[in-house]
Amino acid sequence: MAETLRWGILSTAGIACKNWEAIRNSGNGVVTAVASRDAAKAQQFIDGCQAEVPFEDVPRAIGGYDEIIAADDVDAVYIPLPTGLRKEWVIKAANAGKHVMCEKPCAVSHADLMEMTDACAANDVQFMDGIMYVHSDRMPKLRAALDNPSNVGKITRIASAFSFCAPPEFLAGNIRLSSELEPAGCLGDLGWYTIRATLFVMNFEMPKSLR
């Protein structure tokens, strides 16, 4: 693979704007294409992102997802589609030899997630989820602090919570309130963070019980 990682964004979800910026700021990534079911919507997304965080070579707009999966100038795809739609496109991307970054929660079930990660492993491509804080410079420092017995004793219980105040416009139409598109609801959307943090603290030792 070339030193520059060429990204395709599969969907024009709002969170994709943040990752467009992250790719631009990474120093070794570029966005080469954005796909939506409607090419005009993809172009509108590109125009908005280019106005704020421009790439030297403007990414192209694609109508439909299959074309971006098959594109020769895309090494990796970012998939912020609703959870209920992700499995199909993660597997298609893996089978096309593309690395995958998938928003969380990655799948609607453990079985689906195993199919997705197995497809990536079989095609020797990377699979990552969209939890940003695990890549922060703070995490190695936190790991070192937790592993120092003079700082923390034996951990036997962890309580965690994550919430936000949803405004009326969120409650009126955000896809995260759709049981079909987001069947795990707030547990999948927010619980993914707290569960990941808990597992990190425990060095990914599985819990004995949950309440």
Where are these regions (language model features)?
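N-terminal Rossmann-like dinucleotide-binding module
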Residues: 1-53
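Alpha-helical elements of Rossmann-like donor-binding domains used by nucleotide-donor carbohydrate transfer enzymes
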Residues: 18, 44, 64-67, 76, ...
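Short, Asp-centered acidic motifs that coordinate Mg2+ and/or phosphate
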Residues: 33, 76, 157
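Beta-loop-alpha module in the N-terminal Rossmann-like domain of NAD(P)-dependent dehydrogenases
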Residues: 56-119
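Rossmann-like NAD(P)(H) cofactor-binding subdomain of soluble oxidoreductases
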Residues: 85, 105-109, 128-135, 140
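Rossmann-fold dehydrogenase core element
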Residues: 115-133, 153-157
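Predominantly a Rossmann-like dinucleotide-binding segment in NAD(P)-dependent oxidoreductases
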Residues: 133-211
